[in-house]
Design a protein with these regions (language model features):
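Catalytic cores and adjacent flexible loops of soluble metabolic enzymes
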Residues: 1-119, 123-371
């Protein structure tokens, strides 16, 4: 057994697990059933409950997102588990800019609904889009977790990210999230980045969010933990791995073996939560989940598309597949398989992305590059 190292906490990204697997997430009646089992697992300091595309889906179900958020956060709050949401900085929960007074009000409302932390990101890492939200969240009594959207390009170096972190921390952010939404951040770079931030700002909490799609995530988790990260975002079966996130069981086992202080997992509760999540998938959500999202692919290293977009993109590709082949048949040209289309799409992204200045491929810029 290695020497005891620092404590590492875990956050279950229950919202992102769904968004990265398909188009939708459970109804509120299902969310309130799963929450006590997540609590019972006993290994999560935090749970991602809302934000991102989550609340738009409530509206599609005819649910009131305000009531849904209150209902889902309540069991975690009672158990002393922090809840966190995802917000798009200047764009709040939308795809386009939201007036400042509305954003200011949003944090007050979300805090009243039981959300503790807001993870504020800008797809361009533009601090001017993040800093006002840090101030509004602090005013509302929330913890603003300022985000670095991680990608791999000639521009995105340790120095680049560290200087952004300095500005966000100076603006009042007590926490920094490394949002490796496509899982293409190189483990060595991520470790150096965590060390650089921690050396300068030892009291700032660092949370790592890395998708498992291209296969680097376990090495990245190891590197960030060895260099001072505090919290790791994880998933659980039946929706871990693939384009989603590593499973809590594997991450906990790896870190425990290395001497990190990690919580134990109540496996009875894990299996119950796993079965219940599968039940949600079987009832109707599985219709909107592409089976290929369970696969990891090193091809993703080339295109850098985020886990959260692979679900909707595969559904979109399937939707246009037959139409494209119909046109090709009309021209007496050979038909294309889904794999052919995917490779063409990856090539196109590789061509378009540098021309746009290497924007991190996350909402809304992933959509621009994809479309």
């Amino acid at each position: 057994m290695a020497m005891m190292k620092k404590e590492i906490k875990f956050s279950l990204v229950y919202r992102d697990m769904w968004q990265s697997s398909g188009k939708y997430q459970p109804r509120v009646d299902q969310l309130v059933r799963i929450a006590p089992l997540i609590v019972e697992m006993g290994c999560f300091a935090r749970v991602e409950t809302n934000g991102g595309a989550f609340e738009q889906v409530n509206l599609l179900y005819g649910e009131n997102p305000n009531k849904a958020v209150r209902a889902f956060t309540a069991p975690f709050r009672e158990a002393g588990i922090q809840t966190h949401m995802l917000d798009r900085g200047l764009n709040a929960l939308r795809m386009y800019p939201v007036p400042a007074d509305v954003r200011r009000l949003m944090y007050k409302v979300k805090h009243a609904q039981g959300v503790d932390i807001t993870r504020i990101f800008c797809g361009l890492n533009e601090t001017r889009n993040i800093i006002p939200s840090i101030k509004y969240a602090l005013e509302a009594g929330m913890i603003p977790q300022a985000t670095l959207c991680i990608t791999y390009s000639p521009v995105h170096t340790v120095e680049y990210y560290a200087s952004i972190a300095d500005r966000l921390i100076e603006a009042g952010a007590p926490e920094i999230c490394l949002k490796d939404m496509a899982g293409i951040g190189r483990p060595g770079m991520l470790g150096q980045l965590v060390r650089t931030i921690k050396e300068k700002h030892p009291d700032v909490l660092i949370q790592y969010h890395g998708h498992s799609g291209p296969g680097l995530s376990m090495a990245s988790i190891l590197e960030v933990c060895e260099n001072g990260a505090d919290i790791i975002d994880v998933a659980m079966e039946p929706m871990s791995w693939g384009k989603v996130h590593p499973d809590i069981i594997s991450v906990q086992a790896m870190l425990k073996d290395l001497g990190f202080q990690v919580p134990d997992i109540n496996m009875k509760a894990y299996m119950k939560a796993r079965a219940m999540t599968q039940e949600f998938i079987d009832e109707f959500l599985g219709y909107f989940m592409d089976p290929t999202n369970k696969h990891m692919s090193s091809l993703l290293l080339k295109c850098g598309l985020p886990g959260g977009m692979m679900g909707s993109m595969m559904a979109d590709l399937k939707g246009v597949h037959s139409g494209i082949n119909m046109i090709l048949r009309g021209k007496n040209e050979p038909e294309l398989s889904l794999d052919d289309l995917l490779v063409m799409l990856f090539d196109e992204v590789e061509y378009v992305w540098p021309k746009l200045g290497y924007p991190p491929l996350v909402t809304p810029f992933s959509q621009y590059v994809k479309n």
